[in-house]
Amino acid sequence: MRRIDEVMRKVIGSAIASDLEDPRIGFVTVTAVDTSPDLRSARVYVSVLGDEEEREATLAALASSHGKLQAAIAREVRIKHTPTLTFRYDESLERAMRVSRLLEDDPE
């Protein structure tokens, strides 16, 4: 399953960069893909550079472009079913930066 998740992460990231022309999509990095065991659905975790408004606009644009991204997966990945994609904002990078800042500010 991890191999499929990693391949899908690369395919989706490449498709976002090259195939999508929606102006609402900002600077996006696909950080992880979590595919269900039956391969019918996949959660795509993305980080977006910008404020919350830009994040929301990017997530909405990605959700509306899921058909193109699923077509890219169908072309590149040989699996029985192409999973339905759901996009989520990955807060782990933001949390890590916040912890790092707190540690730097800690006078000990």
Please place each PLM-identified region on the residue numbering.
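Charge-rich, low-complexity N-terminal segments
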Residues: 1-42, 47-108
